[in-house]
Curated annotation (Swiss-Prot):
GO cellular component: chloroplast thylakoid membrane; photosystem I
Family listed: Belongs to the Ycf4 family.
Keyword field contains Disulfide bond: no
Gene giving rise to this polypeptide: ycf4
Gene Ontology terms: biological process: photosynthesis
Protein name, entry field: Photosystem I assembly protein Ycf4
Transmembrane segments: 19-39, 62-82
Length: 181
């Protein structure tokens, strides 16, 4: 029975890159905001530089704007980390003949996203590899009605050999063919 159900855990927004950018934007945003406030009140709020000599309009005002924008993006990123947006699992159940895709969303009516598909509606397992400026390497659940449901999380592109191996294992487990999208 254990080999009839497969569950793949999906890491959501709790990745190192999100922690790094949240911290970087928080520190940078605070620095810019304090520099702008220092130029307005002519009081040095930053110990490592003298920002009282900045002219408030336009330098101080622009620094305050960029600082506030950076803090806003940092807070948003921290909230996605705290709420673990995008995490969940993919469950492939050969006993019940179902595929379940479960993800966490933002608070509200759709906090937990549950997509359920019958294995009889699944045509194949697809792999999509795009190179270039924004490379993507993803595994898809290809349905008979021509919809493609992404199964891999948004992350740094994995090695093509690992992606192919993972897709091949899944296709063998579900007894489906593998296709290139």
């Amino acid at each position: 029975m254990q080999n009839e159900i497969r569950q793949d855990k999906i890491i959501g927004s709790r990745r190192f890159s999100n922690y790094f950018w949240a911290f970087f934007l928080l520190v940078g945003g605070l620095g810019f905001l304090l520099a702008g406030i220092s130029s307005y009140f002519k009081v040095n709020l930053l110990p490592f530089t003298n920002t009282t000599e900045l002219v408030f309009i336009p330098q101080g005002l622009v620094m305050m704007f960029y600082g506030a924008l950076s803090l806003g993006i940092s807070i948003y990123t921290l909230l996605t980390i705290i709420l673990d947006i995008g995490s969940g699992y993919n469950e492939y159940n050969r006993i019940e003949n179902l595929v379940k895709v479960v993800r966490k969303g933002f608070p509200g009516k759709n906090r937990e996203i549950l997509l359920t598909y019958s294995l009889s509606n699944v045509r194949a397992i697809g792999i999509k590899i795009t190179e270039g400026l924004n490379p993507t390497r993803s595994i898809y659940l290809c349905l008979k009605d021509e919809r493609n449901i992404p199964l891999t999380p948004v992350q740094e592109p994995t090695a093509i050999s690992n992606l192919e191996e993972e897709a091949t294992d899944l296709a063998k487990f579900l007894d489906l063919r593998l296709e290139n999208l």
